[in-house]
Amino acid sequence: MAPLGGAPRLVLLFSGKRKSGKDFVTEALQSRLGADVCAVLRLSGPLKEQYAQEHGLNFQRLLDTSTYKEAFRKDMIRWGEEKRQADPGFFCRKIVEGISQPIWLVSDTRRVSDIQWFREAYGAVTQTVRVVALEQSRQQRGWVFTPGVDDAESECGLDNFGDFDWVIENHGVEQRLEEQLENLIEFIRSRL
């Protein structure tokens, strides 16, 4: 049962800690595959849009990496959890509306319920990708541990998930990352 989007050939659900490089990896894949073939979907997009509307905030500023977003992050996490508890598929359904590309990269999968929703909706074409980075690498990218954020379910919900289909190591070694991206791209192309 494919809700409201097209029927994708492949759905890759990316997860990882803040500053692990999830967006970097998904954007690199999209730039190599082409935006006509590959859509990057962000579960946080509809969350931030709805949160901004309900709280009278600037939606565009919530999308960037500014201190503006950070000022609201804890409350946004709390608010998003309340929405998900009421309807676990709420944000998942929103991001697939009208998507026509055959390859979907969900750049910010954070919970087991997100994975379950996509597996139920799209079955065998759904795979999980964990992006990992050493704490030192994340710190070099600007990460600082924030209580109430880095220890919340939105950051830790998939820590013990177990068997990811793919693990991308993004420790700052460009050649190693490139090899992993090439392997993933080869797999993606085999699904087209």
From Swiss-Prot:
Effect on the protein upon substituting residue 17 to M: Approximately 8-fold decrease in Vmax for MgATP and R-MVP. Approximately 5-fold increase in KM for MgATP and R-MVP
Catalytic activity: (R)-5-phosphomevalonate + ATP = (R)-5-diphosphomevalonate + ADP
Residues noted as binding ATP in the record, renumbered to the chain: 17-23, 141, 171, 176, 180
Entry annotated with the keyword ATP-binding: yes
GO biological process, one term: cholesterol biosynthetic process
Entry keyword set: ATP-binding, Cholesterol biosynthesis, Cholesterol metabolism, Cytoplasm, Disease variant, Kinase, Lipid biosynthesis, Lipid metabolism, Nucleotide-binding, Steroid biosynthesis, Steroid metabolism, Sterol biosynthesis, Sterol metabolism, Transferase
Tissue: Heart, liver, skeletal muscle, kidney, and pancreas. Lower level in brain, placenta and lung.
GO-annotated molecular function: ATP binding; phosphomevalonate kinase activity
NCBIfam families: Pmev_kin_anim (TIGR01223)
Quaternary organization: Monomer.
Disease: Porokeratosis 1, multiple types: A form of porokeratosis, a disorder of faulty keratinization characterized by one or more atrophic patches surrounded by a distinctive hyperkeratotic ridgelike border called the cornoid lamella. The keratotic lesions can progress to overt cutaneous neoplasms, typically squamous cell carcinomas. Multiple clinical variants of porokeratosis are recognized, including porokeratosis of Mibelli, linear porokeratosis, disseminated superficial actinic porokeratosis, palmoplantar porokeratosis, and punctate porokeratosis.
Protein name in UniProt: Phosphomevalonate kinase
Gene symbol of the encoding locus: PMVK
